A protein has these predicted regions:
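Active-site glycine-centered loops adjacent to acidic/histidine catalytic or metal-binding residues
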Residues: 58, 119, 149
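P-loop NTP-binding site
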Residues: 184-293
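Conserved glycine(s) of the Walker
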Residues: 16, 155, 246
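Active-site phosphate-binding and catalytic loops of NTP-dependent enzymes
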Residues: 30-32, 99, 171-175, 198-209
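Catalytic P-loop NTPase motifs of RecA-like helicase/translocase cores
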Residues: 39, 62-64, 96-97, 124-125, ...
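Conserved G1/Walker A P-loop phosphate-binding module
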Residues: 1-75, 79-81
Length: 293
């Protein structure tokens, strides 16, 4: 009998959901940085064996939205509650267990298997982790609780084994050679945005979106033109930097990562444009792929 199912990863910002997703899939599907709200979309990563298919979904961190883009991000997270066969609720050793009580209540009332993953235990001690397990058991009495360190791969194999045990009997949902539901252009824009998150401070990374205007692939190389959108002229100047040096650094680092990702020579051109309404315009957000169902 073949097993298959949707395993959706939810939780608050910056608890390590994307790192865990990448470890479970065994590939770099989601960008992961030390900054909150790195993930903006719902991203699927697919694990296949002869008799099993696990469709993991990484989701944006749960937050109270301040503008339309964040409303869409929350909708991605809430949609993950609706179509999961197994839910992974990820927290860490410093998070307040009662943060975002409304979302947590939705998790508590779910009838599917829920695994509460306490991440980053390498940054704590056995006593503190034990106390957290007790607190979480009181909040989510029906959930299985598994402490892990995704960054160090501690406990990840045990988590994967438990997921395999809980998977329902089902034919595969995707072709067995498919790794994700996202096209190549999506990963290009995400990798460029990752470098912006790493190299710029304050509001700049959160005011930026990337659109790939051209993606031409041949047997040995890829030519990419990408536009970085910001909200204000002042942000455009910061992104470009003195004599274009800041943008050149981001583009160089993005190109290196893209060459590893695609295993090909990459030629990357980046441009910066101002679109002051992109975070609040439904039309603009839709063009950037913010289409929660």
């Amino acid at each position: 009998m073949h097993k298959a199912g949707f395993v959706n990863i939810v939780g608050n910002p910056n608890v390590g959901k994307s790192t865990l997703m990448n470890q479970l899939v065994g590939e770099r599907i989601s960008i992961a940085t030390f900054k909150a709200q790195t993930t903006r979309h719902r991203i699927m990563g697919i694990v296949n064996t002869d008799d099993m298919q696990i469709v993991f979904s990484d989701t944006p961190g749960v937050l109270k939205p301040n503008y339309k883009m964040q409303e869409y991000m929350l909708a991605f997270s809430e949609s993950a509650l609706a179509d999961a066969d197994i839910l992974l609720y990820v927290t860490d050793v410093v998070e307040d267990p009662e943060k975002n009580a409304d979302f947590l209540e939705k998790v508590r009332t779910m009838t599917i298997p829920v695994i509460l993953v306490i991440n980053k235990i390498d940054a704590s001690n056995q006593k503190t982790v034990g106390q957290l397990v007790e607190k979480w058991h009181a909040l989510l009495p029906n959930a299985e609780i598994l402490p892990i360190s995704a960054a160090n791969k501690f406990g990840v194999d045990m988590l994967l084994k438990r997921i395999q045990e809980l998977l329902p009997d089902s034919p595969p949902y995707f072709d067995k050679d498919q790794l994700t539901d996202k096209p190549a252009k999506f990963f290009v824009s995400e990798i460029i945005r990752e470098k912006i998150l790493l190299y710029y401070d304050k509001e700049i990374p959160y005011s930026v979106e990337v659109r790939v205007e051209q993606f031409k692939e041949s047997a040995k190389q890829i030519h990419i033109n990408a536009v970085i959108y910001v909200e204000r002229e002042s942000q455009k100047g910061i992104i470009i930097g003195h004599q274009g040096m800041a943008l050149k650094k981001v583009s160089t680092e993005a190109r290196k990562t893209l060459e590893k990702f695609f295993d090909k020579k990459v030629y990357l051109e980046t441009f910066v444009k101002v679109d002051k309404d992109w975070r609040s315009s439904q039309k603009e957000l839709s063009s950037f792929g913010y289409n929660p169902e």
